[in-house]
A protein has these predicted regions:
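Sensory beta-strand/linker motifs that couple input domains to effectors
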Residues: 1, 24, 181
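PAS/PAC or PAS-like capping segment
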Residues: 2-3, 176
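Surface-exposed, flexible loop/turn segments at secondary-structure boundaries
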Residues: 3-4, 184
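Amphipathic alpha-helical "output/dimerization" segments
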Residues: 5-27, 83, 165
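Metal-dependent catalytic cores of enzymes that make or break cyclic nucleotides
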Residues: 9, 33, 40, 44-224
Length: 224
């Protein structure tokens, strides 16, 4: 357990150091694109390593990114906005690198104290990429993907269109993928059952506009 804590702390420290290095290096325009790709690949690898700690969530972020891109395209978003939500999907759970495995992989219900710790992951993730110019637009998506349309989400209790449109799409994609994959405490739900649940919580947990766009893409086979 002590080793695990040390590794987690060192990983967070490395990410913050890399972020600072990247900010200083932007003065050299020739290196910008290479550095951008290298840094993004580094934090994506860290995000993947978080999922690798739990076989039930392996591939989750990539699927959330793919679903989010489809919904954004359904809504007619620009190529640039679709690229940004792709990044947001890939990195939305990055902050879980700072959450203890005993909480991440707990097979049963979290205690109130454990849930409060889990609720910190959007803030941790947004802080890791804060100040990186090319990822700056993605920060609110990561911070807001657990906000609810009715204002009862976290970490800030934002409501309705006070949540970024990207955060609202990520919430739909995240919910659908969570329901349609196995978890320690239940088997995956059928896609139709998950779709019905999204429709049921549209207007409370989720943005109805985003759920409608998701349903249209799902019915036409763009989302499996």
């Amino acid at each position: 357990e002590e080793d695990e804590d040390f590794i987690r702390q060192q990983t967070l420290k490395l990410l913050y150091i890399l972020a600072g290095f990247f900010s200083l290096s932007l003065e050299n325009a020739y290196l910008f694109e290479d550095l951008k790709r290298s840094y993004f690949d580094t934090i994506r690898a860290v995000a993947n390593s978080v999922e690798a700690r739990d076989p039930y969530t392996r591939g989750h972020s990539a699927r959330v990114a793919d679903i989010s891109k489809v919904v954004a395209a359904e809504l007619g978003w620009s190529k640039r906005d679709i690229e940004l939500i792709d990044w947001g999907g890939i990195l939305h759970d990055l902050g879980k690198v700072g959450i203890h495995d005993a909480i991440l992989n707990k097979p049963g219900k979290l205690t109130d104290e454990e849930f409060e710790i889990m609720k910190s992951h959007p803030l941790i993730g947004s802080q890791i990429i804060e100040g990186i110019s090319f990822l700056e637009p993605v920060t609110p998506f990561i911070l807001e993907h657990h906000e609810r349309f009715d204002g009862r989400g976290y970490p800030r209790g934002l409501k309705g269109t006070g949540i970024s449109k990207e955060g609202r799409i990520l919430a739909v994609a995240d919910s659908f993928d969570a329901m349609t994959t196995d978890r320690p405490y239940r088997k995956a739900l059928a896609a139709r059952t998950a779709m019905d649940e999204l429709l049921r919580v549209a207007g409370t947990q989720l943005d109805p506009e985003m759920v409608t766009a998701f349903e249209k893409a799902w019915r036409t086979g763009k989302i499996k």
